[in-house]
Amino acid sequence: MTQFASPVLHSLLDTDAYKLHMQQAVFHHYYDVHVAAEFRCRGDDLLGIYADAIREQVQAMQHLRLQDDEYQWLSALPFFKADYLNWLRKFRFNPEQVTVSNDNGKLDIRLSGPWREVILWEVPLLAVISEMVHRYRSPQADVAQALDTLESKLVDFSALTAGLDMSRFHLMDFGTRRRFSREVQETIVKRLQQESWFVGTSNYDLARRLSLTPMGTQAHEWFQAHQQISPDLANSQRAALAAWLEEYPDQLGIALTDCITMDAFLRDFGVEFASRYQGLRHDSGDPVEWGEKAIAHYEKLGIDPQSKTLVFSDNLDLRKAVELYRHFSSRVQLSFGIGTRLTCDIPQVKPLNIVIKLVECNGKPVAKLSDSPSKTICHDKAFVRALRKAFDLPHIKKAS
C-alpha cells in the first residue's frame, strides 16, 4: 500500500494544544520519566492491513520540526517558557520509539521512551491512522461532502436554537485525532469561524494559521503517570492536580475528572483545588449526572458555580450540546468540544473509534478507570484492584 505515500502531516503543531501544555510540564517536572503507550481500536475494524502504510508515515514524521514563524507565535502565548520552547525547536520525532505491526489483521502499535518525547506521538499518529484508512476505504469522499453535511447540521442547529439566548454557548473544535483528513478539518473550522459561538480549536497549527484561540489543558495520561510518580497511590490524583498548578498557577485551569471516576475525583478536589482551577471537563459517563455532581460539589464548598466553567467533550454533536446548554446554562459557564461529529461527518464514511493510551510509567502499570467501563484500559489486574482499593471504588467491569 504505497499509492498514498505522501506525508499526511506538514507541521509539528498539527496536534492538540494539551499535548504541548503537558509536554512543557513534563519537561520541567519529570524530565527523566519513561512511559509506554498502546493503540486501541474500540470498534471491530481490522486495521492491520494498513500497518505498512502507517509505518511509512511514522518514518516521515522524523522530518517535522518547529519552524521559525511557529516558534515566534508560541513565544507570544502567555504560558510557554523560553527554556521549553528552545528545547522544542530541537525536538524531532524518533521513529525507533514506535513499533507498528499487523497481528492477524489487528493493528498493533506500541510507543515507548522518555515521556517528554513520547507524549507528542499520540495525536498526530491517530490523525495519520484515521486519514490513511479513509484514503483507502473512502476514496470517493471529499471536502465538499463534509461541508454540505455541516451546512445541513447548521440549518437544523439554527432551528433548534431559535428563540434561545445563545450568548453563553461556546463551541470548540476537538477534531484532530479522528478527522477524515487535514483538509476536511481546516475547511470545517473555517466555516465554523463564521459563527459567533465558535471560540477556538484544540489544533495548534489551525489556531496559528487561522488566528483562533488554542484550547486545551491536560489529558488522562497526566493523571495516569502520577499513579507511579507519586509514592502514595491514594494521593496520586492530588499530586497530579498540585503539579499542574505548579506549572500553570493562573491559567490552563480546566481539570479532567474521569481518570479514576468522577466520584473519586471529587473526593480529591477540595476547596483549594476547586477555587484555583477554573473548571472541569467531562469525558465519560452520563453528562447531566456529571454536571449536577460538579455544581453540587462547588455549592457544598461555598463556591459560586457561575464563576466556574464546565467543558463537555464526550461523543458530542451539535444537538447534544444544545440539550446540555438548555439544562445547565443558567447555573454555570459552559463550553463544548466536538470532535469526530465535525471533522469526520461524511455520508457513507464510518469514523474510527481509536485511541492511544498510557499503559506503563517507569516500567510499572498505570490505569484509566473512567465513568464509562468500556473505556477502562490496563493490562495488570492486580494493579487495577490496588487502584480501586486506594480510591475506594466499587467494582467496575473491565473492558475486554
Swiss-Prot record:
Q: Which PANTHER family match?
A: NICOTINATE PHOSPHORIBOSYLTRANSFERASE
Write the Enzyme Commission number(s) for this entry.
6.3.4.21
Ordered alphabetically, the record's keywords are: Ligase, Phosphoprotein, Pyridine nucleotide biosynthesis
Pfam families in the cross-refs:
NAPRTase (PF04095), NAPRTase_N (PF17767)
Q: What class of enzyme is it?
A: ligase
Family to which this protein belongs: Belongs to the NAPRTase family.
Could you tell me which InterPro entries the record lists for this protein?
N/Namide_PRibTrfase (IPR041525), NAPRTase_N (IPR040727), Nic_PRibTrfase (IPR006406), Nic_PRibTrfase-Fam (IPR007229), Nicotinate_pribotase-like_C (IPR036068)
- Designated gene of the protein: pncB
User: What is the official name of this protein in its record?
Assistant: Nicotinate phosphoribosyltransferase
The record's listing under HAMAP family reads: NAPRTase
Quick one: which pathway?
A: Cofactor biosynthesis; NAD(+) biosynthesis; nicotinate D-ribonucleotide from nicotinate: step 1/1
User: What PTM annotation applies here?
Assistant: Transiently phosphorylated on a His residue during the reaction cycle. Phosphorylation strongly increases the affinity for substrates and increases the rate of nicotinate D-ribonucleotide production. Dephosphorylation regenerates the low-affinity form of the enzyme, leading to product release.
Source domain of life = Bacteria
